[in-house]
Amino acid sequence: MILDEIVQKTREELENRKKEYPLEWLGRSLAYNPYMPRDVKKALQSTPERPYRIIAEVKKASPSKGIIREDFEPVSIAKAYELGGADALSILTEPHYFKGNLEYITQVRRYVPMPLLRKDFIIDSYQILEALVYGADFILLIAAALKASELKELLEYARHLGLEVLVEVHNKEDLTKAIWAGADIVGINHRDLQTFEMHMNLCHELIPLIPQGKIIVAESGLSSPKTLEELHGIGVDAFLIGEHFMRQKDVTQALLDIYPLNKK
């Protein structure tokens, strides 16, 4: 089970980080936190001018594909996404399987104005405090990696700190947990994180079960304008796209190609 393996590795890494940077250190860092929160929900909600939104991902590697982008420079990539009209950025911070780094959030935030997502396997409130200290505006919580009570507790803690939360689901059980926990932003991941198999009909199956008023984000396997138009037509507000962009030499043009209306 790939997800279980990653979560276990995350637990081990987390224990080391807590020793190196105790909770008290993170708490003191907040006193000097220079970051003003950026409006995540506004960035992701549909408008007549921008019927759907793009969360563009800064990602070097993945467990299923290995290294995706050799010439990986997070700030340059972020600037290119801004030129292409990205509404928010997802930044991988998991170091072992995705070759991410928390510092990427801090580096990128200095140069682009859009909200930043800490994309990681968050299982502890310590990681949420880290996200705030390093400059994230919202975090990812994966329903399959958490008990319902844990999901609710972490979601409420993030909101207490002023962070928004994207709750990722892959099946009806995950969705039930997400809704019960109070998720406002629901991410439907076409990729099963236990097997890494793709299920591209998942939005069609789950969207009818989502209460009105939620922001719906589709994730994984997205590479064509036709797919985006189709999924927007059934209720998707935003699309999180990573690998497709990361494999293109010109990520600005890749973004404009997939969303021609993306010239804000």
Swiss-Prot record:
GO terms for molecular function: indole-3-glycerol-phosphate synthase activity; phosphoribosylanthranilate isomerase activity. It comes from the Bacteria. Pfam families: IGPS. Pathway: Amino-acid biosynthesis; L-tryptophan biosynthesis; L-tryptophan from chorismate: step 4/5. InterPro entries: Aldolase_TIM, Indole-3-glycerol_P_synth, Indole-3-glycerol_P_synth_dom, Indole-3-GlycerolPSynthase_CS, RibuloseP-bd_barrel. Gene3D superfamilies: Aldolase class I. Keywords: Amino-acid biosynthesis, Aromatic amino acid biosynthesis, Decarboxylase, Lyase, Tryptophan biosynthesis. Coiled coil: none annotated. GO terms for biological process: L-tryptophan biosynthetic process. The keyword Amino-acid biosynthesis applies. It catalyses: 1-(2-carboxyphenylamino)-1-deoxy-D-ribulose 5-phosphate + H(+) = (1S,2R)-1-C-(indol-3-yl)glycerol 3-phosphate + CO2 + H2O. It is an enzyme of class 4 (lyase). PROSITE patterns: IGPS. Its EC number is 4.1.1.48. PANTHER family: INDOLE-3-GLYCEROL-PHOSPHATE SYNTHASE, TRYPTOPHAN BIOSYNTHESIS PROTEIN. Belongs to the TrpC family. This is Indole-3-glycerol phosphate synthase. It comes from Wolinella succinogenes (strain ATCC 29543 / DSM 1740 / CCUG 13145 / JCM 31913 / LMG 7466 / NCTC 11488 / FDC 602W) (Vibrio succinogenes). The gene is trpC.
